[in-house]
Structures are given as structure tokens and as C-alpha cells.
Curated annotation (Swiss-Prot):
GO terms for cellular component: endoplasmic reticulum; endoplasmic reticulum membrane; endoplasmic reticulum tubular network; nuclear envelope. GO terms for molecular function: kinase binding; NAD+ poly-ADP-ribosyltransferase activity; NAD+-protein mono-ADP-ribosyltransferase activity; NAD+-protein-aspartate ADP-ribosyltransferase activity; NAD+-protein-glutamate ADP-ribosyltransferase activity; NAD+-protein-lysine ADP-ribosyltransferase activity; nucleotidyltransferase activity; protein serine/threonine kinase activator activity. Residues 77-280 form the PARP catalytic domain. This is Protein mono-ADP-ribosyltransferase PARP16. Interacts with KPNB1. It comes from Rattus norvegicus (Rat). It is a single-pass type IV membrane protein. Residues 5-91 form the PARP alpha-helical domain. Auto-mono-ADP-ribosylated. Keywords: ADP-ribosylation, Endoplasmic reticulum, Glycosyltransferase, Membrane, NAD, Nucleotidyltransferase, Transferase, Transmembrane, Transmembrane helix, Unfolded protein response. The lineage of its organism: Eukaryota, Metazoa, Chordata, Craniata, Vertebrata. One of its GO terms (biological process) is negative regulation of cytoplasmic translation.
Amino acid sequence: MQLSNRAAARESVSRDVLAADLRCSLFASALQSYKRDSVLRPFPASYARHDCKDFEALLADTGRLPNLKELLQSSRDTDKQTWDLVSWILSSKILTIHSAEKAEFEKIQQLTGAPHTPVPIPDFLFEIEYFDPANARFYETKGGRDLIYAFHGSRLENFHSIIHNGLHCHLNKTSLFGEGTYLTSDLSLALIYSPHGRGWQHSLLGQTLSCVAVCEVIDHPDVKCQTKKKDSKEIDRSRARIKHSEGGDVPPKYFVVTNNQLLRVKYLLVYSQKQPKRASSQLSWLCSHWFMVAMSLYLLLLLIVSVTNSSAFQHFWNRLKR
């Protein structure tokens, strides 16, 4: 078992270190959340004792994980528990994640519709591929229907669960236009719901990340949106509103998916918050202590005026001019 976990973890990291790093970052973000009992799902069974989740032990072991490049270069003496934990984080029976070229972002923009306003290019881009039977089941549900591509924004801590369990309509808290999973064709809108959050301290991607999901959505009547009737310019009212909607029709650029089987995450856009440069830190310190700086400069000015008006200084100055 020890060799199996070590070999599996090494193989995953060697194949795509950035994708492996992303999984560790999403796991760490969920673990550090105050909602960790609900967002850290799945949870490693080896840390569940007597029907209780040992978060403290898991936090301690996660805190000891080196960055993945260092882990690859480490000797075989590396703690078994480290390899077991990394192997668990990187394992999945239903999907695999791999890093994609930034040029793929242009393809995503075409799939979701060209943006009307400039949008930030992600620092990292990842694609998710699903194994059978999950992949076959999705295409069986799709049948001959088209696919819609749209963005879903959420807090970083939620993505560990989103990746492994999918997006669930009943868990969505944004319900102004009815119960469902909310998506948008506008990346700038999705980013509002994806604030930067604390990830993994040893991440190669960065310690503070923002993540947006690009979803594949089956064009089905259970996907509510502003769409026109077939062969008509008239809005299809049956798809524009959800039953018991408090806000009326679903607004343009939004999609509300009311059936979990109709969508899945296909890409992940990751934005890394850059660390401020030293000069920026110094400027920030000056801004924070502006009153003290102003008073110091004022006192220095008074001292200069006092010295220049003294008789000793006048005598010295007159001798210099001779």
C-alpha cells in the first residue's frame, strides 16, 4: 500500500504538476474554511475516527506538506502519511484534471460568446475530462441537444466539493429568480462571485487564488434563460421564468439550471493574486502612517528654521561668504 500510494502520487505530480497543485490548493482552501464540515467533501476516511472528523490532525499534516516540486525531489524516507495524503488528494475515479494552454481561453470565449467588455485573462487554465460511466451518462442525457457554455462563480473554498460532487441546484443560495444553479455568459459577472481566497501556502500557483468554472450545459427546457422560440423572434416564455420566482424572468446573460444532470464543469479559470512588490509595501506603510510622517516633516522644518535664525548659524554663514 505504501509503495502504491507513493507511486500513484509521484506519477500524478510528474504528469502535470500544475494540475496536481490546483487540487492541493482547492483541498487546502476547503480545509481552512470555517464551513469545512460542509465544503470539505469528500473527506479523507483515514482522518475520520469514531464518526468524528479529525480536522486538527488533517490541518497539521497538510501544513507539513512541501511544495510538489520539492516532494518529487525528496528521498524515499519521506513520511508515509505525507504520500498517503497527497495520493488521496490527487485521486479520483470519475475525472482527471490537466493544465491547458492559455490559447484555449480564446476558444472558451467563442463558446460562451464574445465579451462586450474587456475581461481579465486567467493566469492558469485547466480542463476536466470525465471517465465513463459519468461521461457516457452525460452524453446519453444530452442526446441530440446542443451544448451551452457558461461561467459559474463561487468562493475558492467551494471548488473542492464542486470538482468531486458537481454543482447541485438545491445547494444554491442565490434564489431571486428561483431555485437552481446560476450561470452567466459574462465572465465579468462571474468574477464578482469568485473573490480571491486563501489557498495552499506552498502552492506553485500562488497562495491567494480566485477560480471560475466554465460549465457545459445541455440545452434543455429545464435550463431557464432568455431564448427565442424555434424559427421565431419571440421570447420563449416557458423558459424565461422559474416557478415561484420572486424576481420575475431570468435576466439576459443568465442561465438557471434546475436539473443537476444537465450541467458539468469543463474548464477552470484560475486567477492568482500577485504579491505586492517591496516598493508597494513601503508606499502602503507611508499611507498607513501619513500623520506621523507629516508631523515628523513639520518638526524637521521647525528645526531647520530655528537653526537658520540662530546667531551662531548667522555668524558661521557670514564667515563662509567672505
